[in-house]
A protein has these predicted regions:
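Conserved pre-motif I regulatory segment
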Residues: 1-38, 142
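Conserved nucleic-acid-binding Ia/Ib motif block in the N-terminal RecA-like helicase ATPase lobe
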Residues: 4-9, 61-127, 135-138
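Short, flexible loop segments at the rims of nucleotide/cofactor-binding pockets, characterized by
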Residues: 13-17, 91-95, 147-149
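Conserved phosphate-binding and hydrolysis motifs of nucleotide-dependent enzymes
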Residues: 23, 41-45, 119, 142-145
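Walker A/P-loop NTP-binding motif
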Residues: 24-35, 46-61, 74-77, 82-86, ...
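P-loop (Walker A) phosphate-binding loop of NTP-binding proteins
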Residues: 38-41, 71
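Alpha-helical transmission elements in cytosolic ATPase-linked domains
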Residues: 52, 107, 155-158
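SF2 helicase catalytic motif II
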Residues: 119-165
Length: 165
């Protein structure tokens, strides 16, 4: 998959010339398998889980194809920033508390290819009917343990119940 032209182009845009061992392993596995990545902060996990997504997205579908749940707005914004740096051209939305709900709702009227959000804000959008997760093919739970530690268990259950089976 590292020879995939989409991934090569994305890497060229970041200035990264070589992937680390974990990133190579994730790229090799692709998105067809469930994975758990355990690695210290700053080790490149975000890039490792974003790169394989690029080869699964299609421009024909104007629906949410992947969902990333992060426990904090800071992490959600970091993931969004890394995704945008890949220069894929796919639409991405980031939803989190403290950001105007009206702005997020308006943006969600034209669904992104990738939706990133915090558990509480995603549940708000689900309950208000602002987001449809039925087309999500890939789910990434970044720092899932932290989400549970912060008490987002019920929110995670709500979100997961709205994903396709």
């Amino acid at each position: 998959m590292q020879n995939n032209p989409i991934i090569k182009q994305a890497l060229n845009g970041t200035g990264i010339t070589e992937l680390n061992e974990m990133q190579q392993a994730v790229l090799k596995a692709g998105t067809s398998r469930d994975m758990i990545l355990l690695s210290p902060t700053g080790s490149g996990k975000t890039l490792a889980f974003l790169l394989p997504l690029l080869s699964t997205f299609t421009n024909e579908e104007k629906k949410i194809q992947a969902l990333i749940i992060a426990p904090s707005r800071e992490l959600a914004l970091q993931i969004e920033s890394v995704f945008r740096s890949l220069g894929s051209g796919y639409k991405v939305n980031c939803c989190y508390g403290g950001h105007p709900m009206r702005t997020e709702k308006k943006s969600l009227e034209h669904p992104p290819t990738l939706l990133i959000g915090t558990p509480g804000r995603l549940v708000d959008h689900i309950e208000r009917g602002n987001v449809d997760l039925e087309t999500v093919r890939t789910l990434i739970l970044d720092e899932f343990d932290k989400s549970l530690e912060l008490g987002f268990t019920e929110e995670m259950k709500v979100i997961l119940s709205h994903l396709p089976r």
